[in-house]
From Swiss-Prot:
Residues at the catalytic site: 317, 370
Organism from which the protein derives: Nitratidesulfovibrio vulgaris (strain DP4)
Keywords: Carbohydrate metabolism, Glycogen biosynthesis, Glycogen metabolism, Glycosyltransferase, Transferase
Alphabetical list of InterPro entries matching this protein: A-amylase/branching_C, Branching_enzy, GlgB, GlgB_N_E_set_prok, Glyco_hydro_13_cat_dom, Glyco_hydro_13_N, Glyco_hydro_b, Glycoside_hydrolase_SF
UniProt protein name: 1,4-alpha-glucan branching enzyme GlgB
Pathway annotation: Glycan biosynthesis; glycogen biosynthesis
Keyword Ribosomal protein attached: no
Length: 640
């Protein structure tokens, strides 16, 4: 084997200056491995940031995995080591051999690798960026023109690509990106969802982490194919009218010796003090957000997914753990900030910066925060003191609603406040209502199995939950399997229980979710004013004795929608509900319809509003089905 001779590599001083300032928005094109030609020879240029290393060498296919003989050279005092290596080909495996400041030699993956080998291997793969001809120009232009979808329907189907469907019998369990495109895209669009949210696709060594312990931040996982395969998948989603959101993990990273931790023999990407640099729950390192180069690594990574893969949004995981220095720590296990407080000021600055940059460079791209505390202004603009996210997950709504529905209906009257409390803060943020993967793992059971009663009541409760979620102000998110009433808790090692579609009750649940999505899209009152009081009005929230609530969804210049919910298995006849106008009100949705697997109690498709001669206004008198929700709209041209 001919061992290539590495050569010094010139990097523009301005690129290094921007990196040192934490401001290089295309940093992934400077660091990492990229095809190049030098003196007529084709190869790859390599660059890595390791300011405290004693030496850095390239080891890989190109030199028989020798640890010496192919050195990288320091680029001034920037802390960057770089070299051009002739003869390296696309697809070659490589690692950096870093002799750290502590004298120890470690084989490290490239932090900016564009692809990585399939687990259990952790080597980086020499690849390129510009490898796909995009066909989604119309989608991208329209996204930029319309801006954030605050007043448009958003219904997100959360998916773990490795367990949505699986292959059987050929030894490789995962579908490819192209196979996922063939199956997942038509399924999601057929169900009426507007977006997919993918659990992290950045390469990760452990399946059981679901991608939340990221090993290669710039490399789409090889489980499903190549980086251009993932680009084809996103392209096909856009051409089918489906947005793509990625889960992104800037909160922490794994401690594996080959990864970012102690990269040059020092705490480079993390804090040295474990009270700042180690997460006690997950056994991971926490990024040092106060270091310019680390902030740049993360900010450029966010821009990389948006720019190079045309991603429509990033959902940032575990934001609460970033915001608080004492998160999950006892007294004496954390260090206060410079003002003596518990807020992680560096993390706050980072979140504001990354949100500002994303919204400036990619109008219409969303950022979503999984944030479970009462931190104010998470989804408010940075210039008003907020963190700058587009949306925040409403964890309080999720917790209270699931807790309420887990109660036996006979006890729900005593927990009525759990159902109505969310409206006290529903417009304090731009909320997404999440029924996510976190609610169907670790012994929590599937959504269907959380519901009380016999099988029929469980299914009716689930249909009622979905109608309440879709009717409630806020954007919608549902984890895969929930749409057809998966019985079993989610297991990342096996596919969903698709066999349940053979049962009419489960098919009925899926029909309901599809119809709720179509109602969300077609009725402006269901989505246009999701984030302020003008889109919602209580009709009756106080009938706790019957466990019945009713409210209006509103949009200026559009017909109102009247939603009524009966959270008991009791059929309530001659039930009066006030309404804002007279005439005929047509039924748009009844979750007790036999079409959805219900008992088919209803009102023959419409009710007539009558004048209330005593209290003024109008009312309808109707039959409320058991454990069901109903939606009515006035027939246009009638009433006053």
């Amino acid at each position: 084997m001919t061992i290539p001779c590495s050569r010094p590599l010139f990097i523009e001083p301005f690129d290094l200056y921007l990196f040192g300032m934490g401001r290089h928005r295309h940093l992934y094109r400077i660091l990492g491995a990229h095809p190049a030609v030098q003196d007529g020879e084709a190869g790859y240029r390599f660059a890595v940031w390791a300011p405290n290393a004693r030496s850095v060498h390239l080891s890989g296919d190109c030199n028989g995995w020798r640890h010496e003989g192919c050195p990288l050279f320091p680029v001034g005092v920037s802390g960057v080591w770089a070299a051009f290596v002739p003869g390296v080909r696309r697809g070659s495996l490589y690692k950096f051999v870093v002799r750290g400041a502590d004298g120890r030699q470690e084989q490290k993956a490239d932090p900016f690798a564009l692809w990585a080998e399939m687990r259990p291997g952790v080597a980086s793969v020499a690849w390129d960026i510009d490898n796909h001809a995009w066909g989604d120009g119309a989608w991208m232009a329209e996204r930029a023109r319309q801006g954030l979808p605050l007043e448009r329907p958003v219904s997100i189907y959360e998916v773990h690509l490795g367990s949505w469907r699986r292959r059987h019998g050929d030894g490789h369990p995962f579908l490819t990106y192209d196979e996922l495109g063939d199956q997942l895209i038509p399924y999601a669009t057929g169900m009426g969802f507007t977006h997919l949210e993918l659990l992290p696709v950045a390469e990760h060594p452990l399946d059981q982490s679901w991608g939340y312990q990221t090993g290669h931040y710039y490399a789409p996982t090889s489980r499903f194919g190549s980086p251009e395969g993932f680009k084809r998948f996103v392209d096909r989603c856009h051409q089918a009218g489906l947005g793509v959101i990625l889960d992104w993990v800037p909160a922490h990273f794994p401690r594996d010796a080959w990864s970012l931790g102690r990269f040059d023999g020092t705490a480079l990407y993390e804090h040295l003090d474990p009270r700042l640099g180690e997460h006690p729950d997950w056994g991971t390192y926490i990024f040092n957000y106060g270091r310019n180069e680390v902030r740049n690594f993360l900010t450029a990574n966010a821009l990389y997914w948006l720019r190079e893969f045309h991603i429509d949004g990033l959902r940032m995981d575990a934001v609460a753990s970033m915001l608080y220095l004492d998160y999950s720590r006892e007294a004496g296990q954390w260090l206060p900030n410079r003002h003596g407080g518990r807020e992680n000021l560096d993390a706050v600055d980072f979140l504001r910066e990354v949100n500002t940059v994303i919204h400036a460079e990619f109008p219409g791209a969303m950022t979503l925060a999984e944030e479970s505390t009462a931190w104010p202004g998470v989804s408010r603009p940075v210039y008003t003191g907020g963190l700058g996210f587009s949306f925040k997950w409403n964890m309080g709504w999720m917790h209270d609603t699931l807790g309420y529905l887990a109660e036996d209906p006979i006890h729900r009257a005593y927990h009525h406040g759990s159902l109505t409390f969310s409206m006290l803060y529903a417009f304090s943020e731009n909320f997404v209502l999440p029924l996510s993967h976190d609610e169907v793992v670790h012994g929590k059971g599937a959504l269907l199995s959380k519901m009380p009663g016999d099988m029929w009541q469980q299914q009716a409760n689930l249909r009622l939950l979905y109608a309440y979620q879709w009717a409630h102000p806020g954007k919608k998110l549902l984890f895969m399997g929930g749409e057809f009433g998966q019985w079993n808790e989610w297991d990342e090692s096996r596919e969903l229980d698709w066999c349940l579609y053979r049962f009419p009750a489960h098919e009925g649940i899926a029909r309901l979710v599809g119809d709720l999505n179509r109602l969300l899209r077609s009725e402006p009152a269901m989505h246009r004013r999701d984030h302020d009081w003008s889109g919602f009005r209580w009709v009756d929230f106080a009938d706790y004795g019957s466990s019945v609530i009713s409210f209006l969804r509103l949009a200026e210049g559009e017909r109102p929608l009247l939603w009524i919910f009966n959270f008991t298995p009791v059929v309530r006849r001659f039930y009066r509900v006030p309404c804002p106008r007279g005439g005929t009100w047509r039924e748009l949705c009844n979750t007790d319809s036999a079409y959805y697997g219900g008992s088919d109690v209803g009102n023959a498709g419409a009710v007539m509003a009558r004048e209330d001669h005593w209290g003024g206004g109008h009312f309808i008198e109707l039959t409320l089905p058991p454990l069901a929700a109903m939606c009515f709209a006035p027939v246009t041209g009638q009433g006053t």
